[in-house]
């Protein structure tokens, strides 16, 4: 039987900050991605540091990276890291019930005309996700706890519960449900541009999963059975995210005028 989600009220200053972020117009919303990548990098630093004295800390996943997954169909942008992860109490305390010391100071700075891009300096960069998302879920797995998921569509409260979905092994997965008027942040070119502009000095690989379509001729059997094995990895250049092939989706089977079956393949690289 699935565990009931617990509901928590945001601490008053955090609720105020979120309201300010959601209800005020800011032109440079793109800084949300810089903040979430920066947080992911910090989490990776922490597990790497712990592993220096206890290498077994990396038994739950040796590869340290950040992965970005835009999904236009679902309207989501997902940011995954294989960092230290958060326990249930970390999720509840750090993302809602205990205000960081910079929360009030940042609100005062904003109201005095400071730019939203300063949010990370006050330690509350996570909430910049609400510049472009109307709902956020944070799934996290720390070596010392089970996997939990945090969720909030703002409105003053958030939920947390044990997560029995796909196991992360270790790390954090943030899913942003993008606002209808912000879907350009699901475009590959836009994501690359932001990463290159704001996150070029991150010390871990940033992998971007993208989808491409091509047509190819196949036999009827191949249309059902064919799977692509080889990985096409390319580095766009040293500062850009790494592109990783994770397979393909098939659709739109059709026959051309010669009777040869064709299919449009959506490939994720």
Curated annotation (Swiss-Prot):
* Leader sequence residues: none
A GO cellular-component term linked to this record: endoplasmic reticulum chaperone complex
Compositional bias, Basic and acidic residues, is annotated for 225-245
Q: Which Pfam families match?
A: HATPase_c_3, HSP90
Binding-site residues, ATP: 39, 81, 100, 126
According to its UniProt record, where is this protein mainly located? Answer: cytoplasm
Family statement drawn from the similarity comment of this UniProt entry:
Belongs to the heat shock protein 90 family.
Purpose of the protein: Molecular chaperone that promotes the maturation, structural maintenance and proper regulation of specific target proteins involved for instance in cell cycle control and signal transduction. Undergoes a functional cycle that is linked to its ATPase activity. This cycle probably induces conformational changes in the client proteins, thereby causing their activation. Interacts dynamically with various co-chaperones that modulate its substrate recognition, ATPase cycle and chaperone function. Required for piRNA biogenesis by facilitating loading of piRNAs into PIWI proteins.
Q: What is this protein called?
A: Heat shock protein 83
The organism of origin for this protein:
Drosophila persimilis (Fruit fly)
């Amino acid at each position: 039987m699935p565990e009931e989600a617990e509901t928590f009220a945001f601490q008053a200053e955090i609720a105020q900050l979120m309201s300010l972020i959601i209800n005020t117009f800011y032109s440079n919303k793109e800084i949300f991605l810089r903040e979430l990548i920066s947080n992911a990098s910090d989490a990776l630093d922490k597990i790497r540091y712990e592993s220096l004295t206890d290498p077994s800390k990396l038994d739950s996943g040796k590869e340290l990276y950040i992965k970005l997954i835009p999904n236009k169909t679902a309207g989501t942008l997902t940011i995954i890291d294989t960092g230290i992860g958060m326990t249930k109490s970390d999720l509840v305390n750090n993302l809602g019930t205990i205000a960081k010391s910079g929360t009030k100071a940042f609100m005062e700075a904003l109201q005095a005309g400071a730019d939203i891009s300063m949010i990370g300096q006050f330690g509350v960069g996570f909430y910049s996700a609400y510049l472009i998302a109307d709902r956020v879920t944070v799934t996290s797995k720390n070596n010392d706890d089970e996997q939990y998921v945090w969720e909030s569509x703002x409105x003053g409260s958030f939920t947390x519960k044990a997560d029995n979905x796909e196991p992360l092994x270790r790390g954090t997965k943030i899913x942003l449900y993008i606002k209808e008027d912000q879907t350009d942040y699901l475009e590959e070119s836009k994501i690359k541009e932001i990463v290159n502009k704001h996150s070029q000095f991150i010390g871990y690989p940033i992998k971007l999963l993208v989808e491409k379509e091509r047509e190819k001729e196949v036999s009827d059997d191949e249309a059902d059975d064919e799977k692509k094995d080889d990985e096409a990895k390319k580095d766009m250049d040293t500062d850009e995210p790494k592109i990783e092939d994770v397979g393909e989706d098939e659709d739109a089977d059709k026959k051309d005028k010669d009777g040869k079956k064709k299919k449009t393949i959506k490939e994720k690289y």
